């Protein structure tokens, strides 16, 4: 999982070696990235396409059309340019995930209001609710709303719903 995210967000051999910790050299980490790109060429094509779009337009776009601009995408300074490229790769993915959770929050509100339940917080891709003990009547409808808030074509969005007396003890 770490390798999937790391490659998708443009990690270098140096960066991956640091993430993997002791026992992995920069060369070994770079070889892992190379093997990953050879095994999953569509991922490399996708990320390369995002960078090309950012270079051509100066921005990337989420699935809902929000733009993020990258003024340093053509910077003469290599470090600044590569940072902008990594941001450009990240923006459509993270931005679309943010769009998805915000849409879910909006769409789940009528369900919550119908029962007097409260949404306590949103953390990355999680929503946390306070509900009466023993009342799980809206758990499945909320899960379904979250799975369908923003469809990704043929790619299923899977949502786990957990209930517990506190955040630590969710099951």
Segments and roles (model prediction):
Residues 1-171:
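Conserved catalytic core of nucleotide polymerization and phosphodiester-bond processing enzymes
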